[in-house]
């Protein structure tokens, strides 16, 4: 049975959707924030939260084999060792005490050409994790 299997399909077939999310996640790791449609932003938020959680575990675990395994899983998604190292060594260090909510989606209005709702997707700053 397929109970509770809801996911953001984005009007694309599976491999295209995975490719889209991988590309968007690469951009957010590289630049820190991106502007995209709200539907893509919501799908990207859950995708990136899982990726950052893996990065935090890879950065904090004492088990070397587990850390290498997690880095390889992250690299399989990002496809670039430089971005993998940036995510694990720089970005994940800011979120060690945090239990989720690493990505923020802010609605910024509508696109001029087709009136699609646009959103700003950004990594939450480390200073705002207090509280």
Swiss-Prot record:
Entry GO CC: cytosolic large ribosomal subunit
Gene Ontology BP terms: translation
Keywords (A to Z) from UniProt: Ribonucleoprotein, Ribosomal protein
Molecular function per GO: structural constituent of ribosome
Keyword Lipid metabolism: no
Pfam families linked to this entry: Ribosomal_L17
Keyword ATP-binding: no
Source superkingdom: Bacteria
InterPro entries to which the protein is assigned, alphabetical: Ribosomal_bL17, Ribosomal_bL17_sf
Family from the record: Belongs to the bacterial ribosomal protein bL17 family.
Subunit and partners: Part of the 50S ribosomal subunit. Contacts protein L32.
UniProt name for this protein: Large ribosomal subunit protein bL17
Organism: Thermotoga neapolitana (strain ATCC 49049 / DSM 4359 / NBRC 107923 / NS-E)
Gene: rplQ
